[in-house]
């Protein structure tokens, strides 16, 4: 029986319960508390594998993209089950893969925002009303479904020191010059608890590659400015071929201050933003099975790293 629930909204409490259940069912899966969010929700890691290659996968930087969290959790569960049973995952021998790579994950970077969009926050309570007040100055953005930011109104994927000033200029020109549901870069790079902790964790792990999971568009973004990363395009092309997703350059208005941008700039290694599914966020859970099927080969290819 599956531990990861893919037919109900993935709240922060359900995510934490799932991580605990996975580490109990599969003792070779490990977890640690990375930090607490602005409103005190735990942000946890989930780690599987024992190999020398290190990769880091993140999901739910954006609140209304929470469907990416069960993608990561389901992958860890399927991988763990295959290790325990001496089987394979996606055609790869699980034991061999686990001995060659360690997969670090942060399945829910933005638990406060996710709980707003999934309905886990109660109207009348401070976190909900904080967001509701910020949203009133953006009447054209549906509330709470259009919410991407944390509950301080900062877009966590515009917080990284890789073209942050360019991102600020672009987003301010679009009217996102104050805290709100989306696209506000904050007062300074990495000034939010969530982004500071993830940047520190990334530096601590020093991974060979990162995947940042978002929705939507069935697209893989792979580059930052003119930074040349050996093998990045080739690996991206392989992931695109196996998933059916398109490998594309990031549109200019979204090309700065993202997590993968920062990783590419400072580490000089492959970093990818994966935009899963199609439609209007938050994507319905009816898309989950297709999203997971498309992304399993991406997750495995990134872990193996061979072109």
Q: What annotation goes with each model-predicted range?
A:
Residues 163-307:
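Metallocarboxypeptidase
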Residues 63-69:
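Di-metal (Zn2+ and/or Mg2+/Mn2+) metal-binding site signature of metallo-dependent hydrolases
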């Amino acid at each position: 029986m599956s531990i990861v629930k893919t037919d109900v909204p993935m709240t922060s409490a359900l995510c934490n319960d799932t991580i605990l259940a996975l580490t109990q069912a599969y003792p070779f899966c490990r977890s640690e508390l990375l930090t607490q969010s602005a409103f005190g929700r735990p942000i946890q890691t989930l780690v599987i594998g024992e190999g020398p290659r290190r990769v880091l996968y993140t999901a739910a930087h954006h609140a209304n993209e929470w469907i990416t969290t069960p993608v990561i959790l389901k992958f860890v569960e399927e991988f763990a089950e295959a290790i325990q049973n001496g089987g394979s995952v996606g055609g790869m021998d699980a034991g061999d893969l686990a001995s060659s790579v360690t997969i670090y994950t942060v399945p829910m970077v933005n638990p406060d925002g996710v709980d707003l969009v999934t309905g886990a926050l109660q109207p009348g309570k401070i976190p909900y009303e904080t967001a509701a007040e910020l949203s009133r100055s953006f009447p054209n953005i549906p509330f709470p479904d259009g919410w991407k930011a944390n509950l301080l109104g900062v877009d966590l994927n515009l917080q990284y020191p890789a073209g942050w000033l360019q991102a600020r200029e672009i987003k301010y020109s679009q009217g996102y010059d104050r805290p709100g549901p989306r696209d506000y870069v904050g007062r300074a790079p990495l000034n939010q608890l969530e982004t500071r902790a993830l940047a520190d964790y990334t530096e601590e792990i020093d991974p060979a590659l990162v995947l940042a999971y978002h929705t939507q568009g069935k697209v893989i973004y792979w580059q930052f400015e003119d930074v040349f990363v050996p093998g990045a395009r080739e690996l991206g092309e392989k992931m695109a071929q196996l998933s059916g997703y398109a490998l594309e350059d990031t549109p200019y208005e979204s090309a700065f201050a993202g997590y993968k941008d920062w990783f590419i700039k400072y580490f000089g290694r492959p970093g990818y933003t994966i935009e899963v599914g199609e439609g209007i966020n938050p994507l319905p859970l009816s898309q989950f099975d297709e999203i997971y099927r498309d992304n399993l080969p991406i997750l495995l290819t990134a872990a193996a790293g061979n072109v």
